[in-house]
Amino acid sequence: MSRIVSVGISEFKIASAPTILMTYGLGSCVGIALHDPVALTGGLAHTLLPAPVRGMDSMVKSAKFTCWAVDLMVEELIKCGCVAERLVAKLAGGATMFEPQHRTTHSGIGERNVTAAKEALERRGIPLVASDTGDDYGRSLEFNTVTGVITVRALQRPIKRM
Amino acid sequence: MKFDALTEEHLDALKEVSNIGVAHAATALSQLIGKGITLQVPKVHLMKITEVPEAFGGAERIVVGIYLQMLGDARGNILIVLPRESALKLLSRLLPREKSEGSLLTELEISALKEVGNILASAYLNALGALMRKTLIPSVPVLSFDMAGAVIDYVLIELGEVGDLALMVETEFFGEEEKIGGQFFLLPDPESLRIILDAIGVKL
């Protein structure tokens, strides 16, 4: 039996094979998975916002912000014996849950979360090997740290593996 | 005003004003469906953003979320959460024809549920506004039918920008005969919290 570890909003968790990392109900939030296929270790983050607003950037660094989540996970993964050059990334989430006419202050937050995640990965030189982002529905993720495969479940939609 | 600076007295006051607001909303709903609606005593949740999906009954619960912004003299978010079964039951009372097969909502059903949200939120904010002697108005409602976690992360965006805590005033309501029920959540902005408490005469 593999152990299951659940990741909440604005959290990230690191785990090694055969643990399964899960996160539930990603809407505009984005799920970022990093995997080292040799060390069979991975990290999964569930981020809420792309980056802190001005004046708030003195906050304690957490995976609440997409721009920090990748850095925090990489540091932790290296401590756990992973090699930065071997890491690969997968992204899911970043949906638009409510109709666009309503989006005023947080317009396009899902999309901005995805962009922030891609930028953070690029800064670290981590290749993005698969993604399932955007659209207008919520997703739950199951990340297998043995295979690196992510299973994406959504309401009324076929299960996706990537 | 920082959420963690709130005292028991503040929280009780919030429960009380919310109770009055939801009572008006329940009357409106009861008139709409022609059945009595009962309310539970409001609960105030002050919790980490990470814990919010649990308070909504679990991130994967399938719900209809109707979201409105509170605008005017105080700002915040209103979220009305109807479990799937409850939303369908409500629709069967509001719309004449039988529910079509499949569990996606039609345009007409979405529109009807948004209108319910609008009526509930307007009644709630009218009562709250009268109590505060302030003007509070709801924005145009939007709706999402999905996993609770995916529906609510949108509501947490503004709160997440300024802190890690969410303050939610929750009132559950039930139909007396029909299996209609749901949760009414008010999530005031930290700044507006001061305005609300001040307006109802609670010492800060």
UniProtKB/Swiss-Prot annotation, chain A:
Keyword annotations: Chemotaxis, Hydrolase
E.C. numbers: 3.5.1.44
Keyword Hydrolase set for record: yes
Statement: the UniProt record of this protein carries the keyword Methyltransferase: no
Any Pfam family the entry gives: CheD
EC class: hydrolase
GO biological process, one term: chemotaxis
SUPFAM superfamilies, A to Z: CNF1/YfiH-like putative cysteine hydrolases
Entry GO MF terms: protein-glutamine glutaminase activity
Database matches in InterPro entries: CheD-like_sf, Chemorcpt_Glu_NH3ase_CheD, Cytotoxic_necrot_fac-like_cat
Recorded catalytic activity of this chain's protein: L-glutaminyl-[protein] + H2O = L-glutamyl-[protein] + NH4(+)
Family the UniProt entry places it in: Belongs to the CheD family.
Known role: Probably deamidates glutamine residues to glutamate on methyl-accepting chemotaxis receptors (MCPs), playing an important role in chemotaxis.
The name this protein goes by in its record: Probable chemoreceptor glutamine deamidase CheD 3
UniProt organism field: Geobacter sulfurreducens (strain ATCC 51573 / DSM 12127 / PCA)
